[in-house]
Amino acid sequence: MHFKRGSEGHSLPLPCMHRSMQDISQHLKQWPRFVLQAGFYWPTTFKDAHGFVSSCDACQRKGNFTKRNEMPQHFILEVEVFDVWGIYFMKKTIFSWKPIHPNGGRLCLKMGGSSCEPH
């Protein structure tokens, strides 16, 4: 692998970095981050990391990702709660409401046998 820092090219000891990583899920996360934190420019970072881990015998013997480490595969439903048309529609209907009670919309409580009468 050949990495660039500015205009000069360098080679990094990939087997040394590889031996320090134990988990396959850490390979794809730590290896590119290590190179980028060292100040190197690496245009095909994640493609090369995937190819390196795929060709490594120790990584392939480690096994697959567990369900815990997998990315969730369900859809996220995105709903716009306050739609502009809906708010406008609600304002028009709320202001056009009229009292439907015969007493003009006053609250009447029925206590025992008596009820309130409109004034």
UniProtKB/Swiss-Prot annotation:
Q: Which UniProt keywords apply?
A: Mitochondrion
Entry-linked InterPro entries: Gypsy_RT_Integrase-like
Can the keyword Mitochondrion be found in this entry's annotation?
A: yes
Does the record carry Mitochondrion as a key word? yes
Q: What is its main location?
A: mitochondrion
GO CC, sorted alphabetically, is: mitochondrion
**Protein location:** Mitochondrion
Please, what other remarks does the record include?
A: A stretch of 270 kb of the mitochondrial genome is duplicated within the centromere of chromosome 2 resulting in the duplication of the gene. The expression of the duplicated gene (At2g07686) is not demonstrated.
Q: Which PANTHER family match?
A: ENDONUCLEASE-RELATED
Query: What is the name of this protein?
Result: Uncharacterized mitochondrial protein AtMg00750
